[in-house]
Amino acid sequence: MKTETPSVKIVAITADEAGQRIDNFLRTQLKGVPKSMIYRILRKGEVRVNKKRIKPEYKLEAGDEVRIPPVRVAEREEEAVSPHLQKVAALADVILYEDDHILVLNKPSGTAVHGGSGLSFGVIEGLRALRPEARFLELVHRLDRDTSGVLLVAKKRSALRSLHEQLREKGMQKDYLALVRGQWQSHVKSVQAPLLKNILQSGERIVRVSQEGKPSETRFKVEERYAFATLVRCSPVTGRTHQIRVHTQYAGHPIAFDDRYGDREFDRQLTEAGTGLNRLFLHAAALKFTHPGTGEVMRIEAPMDEGLKRCLQKLRNAR
């Protein structure tokens, strides 16, 4: 990247970035800037490609030089990251794998993947603060805020396209570990129940089993049994919102400390057993996919945090 002045950026378009519209490209370069402002600077001719004015639908070509004017990000957006510097630094400790194409991390429970909806900080905002030199960082998939484990981030548009294609074609395998109520029957290896999203009057999003919903399937395997709970491995075949949480509830075995689909009596039992658990026991343990750059089949595992390990050890000791 060349710099024309301390505040104006000149960006040379790479082959990986070619083919996208200039308005979409600017949205990746000007994080936190409203779309209305991006279209305004395009209309006013403040953005130039090869020193010429362009329209928002202009498609970039490799070798194009894009002039990006200084744009002041809203102060509240800038200030949002500063109280979370400790969280940003902590993200560096949970990176499981990184190369020029992808970054994989072990997302902590309680951290959203994206800021928004009243949250000023998310994993992707933290990674952008941690990797300010990265021109592209986008989530390949999502994890619920309270779910921990493997989270895949693309560092190139071509990588994101390849990995999204794998998701669409079911070429990516995700394995989760969940602690559920009661004794999961070994013969129940799959739950197939259509899921429908609902928005409550409070604005809360909830998912229910409904014949009007989308076809959904999760495969299950018993990993370990305890006196009043079971650790199961969950492999979603489809990727619906809250799928594992709703399918375990539908099967009669809700997940521990699930504030939306769980069972308060089960949570109380775990507390009285001295497990120390106070979070959703759902962990994305492994992710298998084809590397978008090398074609190598990769399987990346994320260890459980100490709180989940202590909980399981307590349950083992109580058997």
From Swiss-Prot:
Active site positions, chain numbering: D144
Domain S4 RNA-binding: 20-83
GO biological process, one term: enzyme-directed rRNA pseudouridine synthesis
EC numbers, comma separated: 5.4.99.24
InterPro entries for the chain: PsdUridine_synth_cat_dom_sf, PsdUridine_synth_RluA-like_CS, PsdUridine_synth_RluC/D, PsdUridine_synth_RsuA/RluA, RluA_PseudoU_synthase, S4_RNA-bd, S4_RNA-bd_sf
Assigned keywords, A-Z: Isomerase, RNA-binding, rRNA processing
Reactions catalysed, as given in the entry: uridine(955/2504/2580) in 23S rRNA = pseudouridine(955/2504/2580) in 23S rRNA
Gene3D superfamilies the UniProt entry points to: Pseudouridine synthase, RNA-binding S4 domain
Statement: the UniProt record of this protein carries the keyword Isomerase: yes
Gene Ontology cellular component terms for the protein in this record: cytosol
Keyword RNA-binding appears in the UniProt entry: yes
Pfam family, one: PseudoU_synth_2
GO terms assigned for molecular function: 23S rRNA pseudouridine(955/2504/2580) synthase activity; pseudouridine synthase activity; RNA binding; rRNA pseudouridine synthase activity
Disruption phenotype: No visible growth phenotype. An rluC deletion suppresses a bipA deletion; in a double rluC-bipA deletion the cold-sensitive growth and ribosome assembly defects at 20 degrees Celsius due to bipA are fully suppressed and decreased capsule synthesis is partially suppressed.
Top-level EC class: isomerase
Function: Responsible for synthesis of pseudouridine from uracil at positions 955, 2504 and 2580 in 23S ribosomal RNA.
Similarity annotation: Belongs to the pseudouridine synthase RluA family.
Name by which UniProt lists this protein: Ribosomal large subunit pseudouridine synthase C
Gene field: rluC
